[in-house]
């Protein structure tokens, strides 16, 4: 734990110098900073090749920002041409949906493909660009570009039978929202389409009310809540012109989930990820598309859970020059890379240790290196870039300094990379580095020449020991400007709080609003608990069957630490978050109400029985299997402990965390005569923008000034 004495605090906050000016409230409110206070970093556009990269920037003596090509060996900038920006992939082809109809474009020639009333979704070219596959009315179709023929591949699509179009819980929790419900996959040889068929008829329907118009309307979604029936899923194979579907050898009646499947590079088989409903036994099968037979290729079991969602197939990386693949797994308590033969046999671990591999950026089979991004090897609050041999030897850090390297852009063959890096006290910089870790060129510094003339609030990363003494928990603290040791300040804690979803990084994050709050005398804290990912899967496992408990133990310990040190006013301790962060905020003013006095909760889960099956049961098992866990994690269980001031906010059409959660909390508070603040955003989903987004920001600002700062809001701050 990093201990801070009154003497050190006095020294720390007096070291800024008497000659520095203070940014005015008006400058911060309007975000109109002095000249040369901040510089815009170059914007990475793309690599042209190993020696040339396009950056959007201003190159002296020109002050106009435009696209430049940096010739790395020559060290010279030239303005990028249209051809360089456009790329080298003529003739350009695209398939897109406009007004629900499918259009195909080659060069400048556009053609409408579909004309019926059914809305087309997710057009995808075959790898040989001869076909476009898409769904409409919950059936799968193809369009043959050369002949203009449309082929219908499935014929049983209904409101509850979906072919090639994912059921809601798969889209939200397994495949990811970026997939846009797509549930079909071309084989590499363009001869087969694998797809999933979802039967939702047994899944409970959840109604969402739309208040627009004279009579309003209902939007109904098949939404499986914890312990409820899931959709039945089949995996099938069909040719691009139709014919009988070959079904994979799985029993659709089993209580199971399927992950994002991955074709082998030769199209000979499809790797299908299967997991039981309890989500503690992952099996990967090689499925033959010609007859549907399956062969177990990989199996992983954990006492808590195995993550099925993997960024749309990111668990596997097949090699080109040998019959092997790289698999990512957190089975040891940390996410690492493993080299397997194509039959699934483990050859060797590639990485190991108390850190987590986040992404593979390049597999260089010729040079014999794997380039990857990892978190936690240097510090749990930093990410860095590394390379390692296939046998796990010669692990080399390529990034540098005590910085968080937040954006890595590697050249196509891995000779160079561009990194954007900073820490809590150092503004962001952009640097060009080679694959030996040597800095080649500084590309930009966001710190302007005038920044040092101004007194800024100090932000630092500290560690707070957990109450059980097992963890050094990270907190990013922005202290009040002109901090006075011994004076107690109100404190605002911002967090998300979900499993393996930490928000604390040792990085620079300029915010005019944060500087204004610091001038007003507010301690601002971002804090991550033991299960936020800083301590690997081993730390996240604490949440198993017990959501809310360990998170709140750590949040309360953090708040008590500031109170005990005489820095925080125990009567003004506020916590705020959205979604899972909203849940924690509500839990803080019930279970944790002896420590927290105020909370702003948005889009909150209140009772985990009201959230979806896949996410909830991964951590909690079903309500039938874990009744005590669901009871203790329920905000309503602790409602009689409620005290303080709670602001509850929800979008009326939230299809993820239903407004039902907030309404049940409100009902319980009203039944007990408890006071609270409440705001609805009509039509709002799980988040909202536009004028309602501005209103939401103003709402939170008013809360901070009224309840924490207890002063008038500066003119112009509320828009």
Describe each region flagged by the PLM.
Residues 25, 31, 73-80, 153-185, ...:
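Predominantly five- to eight-bladed beta-propeller fold
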Residues 49, 54-61, 91-106, 132-139, ...:
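Beta-strand C-termini and the immediately following turn/loop, strongest in propeller blades
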Residues 72-73, 106-109, 145-148, 239-243, ...:
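Short loop/turn segments that connect beta-strands within beta-propeller blades
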């Amino acid at each position: 734990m990093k201990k801070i004495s009154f003497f050190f605090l006095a020294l720390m906050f007096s070291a800024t110098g008497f000659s520095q000016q203070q940014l005015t409230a008006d400058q911060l409110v309007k975000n109109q900073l002095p000249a040369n206070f901040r510089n815009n970093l170059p914007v990475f556009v793309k690599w042209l090749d190993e020696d040339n990269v396009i950056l959007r920037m201003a190159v002296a003596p020109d002050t106009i920002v435009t696209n430049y090509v940096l010739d790395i060996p020559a060290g010279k900038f030239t303005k990028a041409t249209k051809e360089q920006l456009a790329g080298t992939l003529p003739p350009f082809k695209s398939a897109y949906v406009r007004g629900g109809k499918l259009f195909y474009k080659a060069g400048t020639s556009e053609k409408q493909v579909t004309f019926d009333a059914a809305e087309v979704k997710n057009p995808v070219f075959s790898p040989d660009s001869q076909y476009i596959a898409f769904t409409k009315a919950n059936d799968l179709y193809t369009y043959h570009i050369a002949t203009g023929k449309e082929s219908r591949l499935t014929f049983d699509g209904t409101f509850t039978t979906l072919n090639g179009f994912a059921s809601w819980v798969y889209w939200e929790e397994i495949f990811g929202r970026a997939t846009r419900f797509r549930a079909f996959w071309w084989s590499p040889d363009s001869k087969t389409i694998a797809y999933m068929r979802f039967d939702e008829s047994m899944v409970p329907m959840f109604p969402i009310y739309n208040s627009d118009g004279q009579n309003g309307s209902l939007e109904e979604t098949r939404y499986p809540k914890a312990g409820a029936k899931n959709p039945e899923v089949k995996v099938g194979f069909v040719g691009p012109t139709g014919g009988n579907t070959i079904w994979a050898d799985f029993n659709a009646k089993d209580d199971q989930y399927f992950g994002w499947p991955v074709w082998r590079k030769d199209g000979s088989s499809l790797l299908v990820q299967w997991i039981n409903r309890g989500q503690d036994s992952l099996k990967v099968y090689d499925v033959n598309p010609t007859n549907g037979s399956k062969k177990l290729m990989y199996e992983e079991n954990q006492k808590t859970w195995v993550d099925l969602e993997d960024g749309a197939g990111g668990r596997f990386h097949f090699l080109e020059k040998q019959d092997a693949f790289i698999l990512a797994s957190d089975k040891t308590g940390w996410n690492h890379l493993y080299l397997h033969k194509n039959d699934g046999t483990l050859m060797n671990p590639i990485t190991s240790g108390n850190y987590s591999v986040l992404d593979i950026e390049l597999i260089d089979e010729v040079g014999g290196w794997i380039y990857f991004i990892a978190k936690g090897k240097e510090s749990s609050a930093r990410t860095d870039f590394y390379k390692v041999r296939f046998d796990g030897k010669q692990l080399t850090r390529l990034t540098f300094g005590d910085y968080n390297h937040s954006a890595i852009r590697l050249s196509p063959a891995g000779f160079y990379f561009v990194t954007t890096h900073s820490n809590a006290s150092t503004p962001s910089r952009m640097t060009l580095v080679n694959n030996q870790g040597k800095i080649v060129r500084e590309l930009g510094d966001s710190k302007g020449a005038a920044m040092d003339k101004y007194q800024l609030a100090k932000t630092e990363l500290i560690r707070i020991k957990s109450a059980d003494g097992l963890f050094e928990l990270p907190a990013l603290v922005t202290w009040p400007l002109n901090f006075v040791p011994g004076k107690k300040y109100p404190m605002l804690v911002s967090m998300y709080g979900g499993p393996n979803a930490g928000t604390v990084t040792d990085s620079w994050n300029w915010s005019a609003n944060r500087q204004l709050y610091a001038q007003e005398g507010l301690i601002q804290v971002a804090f991550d608990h033991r299960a936020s990912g800083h301590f690997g899967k081993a730390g996240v496992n604490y949440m198993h069957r017990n959501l809310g408990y360990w998170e709140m133990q750590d949040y309360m310990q953090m708040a008590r630490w500031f109170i005990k040190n005489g820095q925080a006013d125990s009567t003004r301790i506020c916590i705020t978050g959205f979604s899972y962060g909203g849940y924690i905020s509500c839990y803080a003013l019930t279970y944790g109400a002896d420590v927290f006095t105020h909370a702003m909760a948005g889009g909150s889960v209140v009772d985990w029985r009201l959230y979806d099956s896949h996410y909830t049961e991964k951590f909690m098992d079903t309500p039938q299997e874990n009744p005590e866990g669901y009871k203790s994690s329920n905000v309503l269980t602790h409602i009689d402990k409620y005290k303080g001031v709670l602001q509850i906010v929800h979008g009326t059409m939230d299809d993820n965390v239903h407004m039902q959660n907030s309404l049940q909390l409100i009902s319980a508070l009203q039944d007990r005569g408890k006071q609270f603040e409440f705001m609805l955003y009509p039509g709002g989903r799980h988040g909202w923008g536009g004028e309602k987004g501005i209103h939401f920001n103003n709402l939170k600002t008013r809360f901070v000034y009224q309840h924490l700062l207890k002063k008038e809001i500066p003119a112009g701050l509320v828009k």
